[in-house]
Amino acid sequence: MPKLEMMLLVLLILPLCYIDAVGPPPPWNMEDEIIEHWQKLHCHEISDLTPWILCSPEPLCGGKGCCAQEVCDCSGTACTCPPCL
């Protein structure tokens, strides 16, 4: 077998071995990425101690604990939002 053909064969087989050793890539969840991007644009995180509570300058409902700033009750490091109607 000529050297060029041998080199091409090795270059074709080598990536297959690497992919098998590493395993398949994790599934991509577009919904979580969209929610995270939306929260970065519209929400303000109050405290590192309560990352699940977010206050927004707009009256928003749902979306992982996001509520309007005027109804978001914050004292110290804790914040609470009223339930959405």
From Swiss-Prot:
Keyword Glycosyltransferase applies: no
Propeptide stretches in the record: 22-40
Reported modifications of this chain: Contains 5 disulfide bonds.
Main location: secreted
Gene Ontology terms: cellular component: extracellular region
GO molecular function: toxin activity
Keyword Cell cycle set for record: no
Signal peptide boundaries: 1-21
Subcellular location: Secreted
UniProt similarity note: Belongs to the conotoxin D superfamily.
Domain comment as written in the entry: The cysteine framework is XXVIII (C-C-C-CC-C-C-C-C-C).
Function description: Probable neurotoxin.
Protein name: Conotoxin Lt28.4
UniProt organism field: Conus litteratus (Lettered cone)
